[in-house]
Amino acid sequence: MNSETLPAELPATLTIASRESRLAMWQAEHVRDALRKLYPACDVKILGMTTRGDQILDRTLSKVGGKGLFVKELESALADGRADLAVHSLKDVPMALPEGFALAAVMSREDPRDAFVSNDYASLDALPAGAVVGTSSLRREAMLRARHPRLDVRPLRGNLDTRLAKLDRGDYAAIILAAAGLKRLGLAARIRALLDVDDSLPAAGQGALGIEIAARRADVAAWLAPLHDHASALAVEAERAVSRALGGSCEVPLAAHAVWRGGELHLTGSVSTTDGARVLAAHAHARAATAADALALGRRVSDALERQGARAIVDALVAASAQAQKGGA
């Protein structure tokens, strides 16, 4: 490679940290290919890593430490220089990044909706009473319990291929997955129905890819700038602001979804109890040109949820989760 052909300040090699699941590697390869197209003289590599979240498969995330389990090892690689950037599904990234790290880019968003997947049934309504439905999140569990109390909702862990394998061997009559992951892996044919956001409000950031860097690496942020999608980033920022303000994590069935309509960003947020017996929702819209605008919109929705009693729900669930983790230690 002729270093003289590289843009000024661009290194000969860029390294992307990624989890090693098939979906995570697809996402990392997607970013790698985009960077190679932008900077053909730069050698862009992927550093595959196994995170603690990938290793713990017998318990739900809410019982073992939450979303941070999927990113800590990748952040360690950023901190010590083994990697220049890390690629994440934004719904799996904690709402507040640790000190010293920054979200440098949000790429154009894929479908944020949840997908109904089954080999024998066309929709949730078609399932018989008592049918076993698998889900990996408290948010989806609460939705199912609220809207379909006749179903038997059970935890579902593992990567995407593992979850589909559990369905195929008959452990579940149906499972609920993020549509984005299925589409990215060419598995859209497995989707029997897409759940309308009014019926299953997505998790904050669902369907979006985020690129994390060490905050000190302004050089990397500059190289990633062409990959940043401003409209997607503002929508995700508003969603994450709702969750951040309420202390959202894997312990809480909290959802937030923003969509552009008529030049305005429309944001809906929801908090519920895990049994689905109580569901709170709030909506607001505004013209949002900057991250500050998106944050303000998110705060309006979180404030509205707090006025309805969301704080008490969140605090009770977080306390219960902490007690469960302490008991299982």
Swiss-Prot record:
Enzyme Commission number: 2.5.1.61
Enzyme class: transferase
Gene3D superfamilies listed in its UniProt record: Periplasmic binding protein-like II, Porphobilinogen deaminase, C-terminal domain
Superkingdom in the source lineage: Bacteria
InterPro entries given in the database record: HemC, Porphobilin_deaminase_cofac_BS, Porphobilin_deaminase_N, Porphobilinogen_deaminase_C, Porphobilinogen_deaminase_C_sf
A Gene Ontology biological process term: protoporphyrinogen IX biosynthetic process
UniProt pathway: Porphyrin-containing compound metabolism; protoporphyrin-IX biosynthesis; coproporphyrinogen-III from 5-aminolevulinate: step 2/4
Keywords of this entry: Porphyrin biosynthesis, Transferase
Database matches in SUPFAM superfamilies: Periplasmic binding protein-like II, Porphobilinogen deaminase (hydroxymethylbilane synthase), C-terminal domain
Catalytic activity field: 4 porphobilinogen + H2O = hydroxymethylbilane + 4 NH4(+)
Cofactor entry: dipyrromethane
GO molecular function: hydroxymethylbilane synthase activity
Gene Ontology cellular-component terms listed: cytoplasm
Cofactor stoichiometry and binding remark: Binds 1 dipyrromethane group covalently.
Post-translational modification S-(dipyrrolylmethanemethyl)cysteine, affected residues: C250
UniProt-listed NCBIfam families: hemC
Complex formation: Monomer.
Family statement drawn from the similarity comment of this UniProt entry: Belongs to the HMBS family.
Further details from the record: The porphobilinogen subunits are added to the dipyrromethane group.
HAMAP family assigned: Porphobil_deam (MF_00260)
Known function: Tetrapolymerization of the monopyrrole PBG into the hydroxymethylbilane pre-uroporphyrinogen in several discrete steps.
Name of this protein: Porphobilinogen deaminase
Origin species: Burkholderia mallei (strain ATCC 23344)
Biological classification of the source: Bacteria, Pseudomonadati, Pseudomonadota, Betaproteobacteria, Burkholderiales
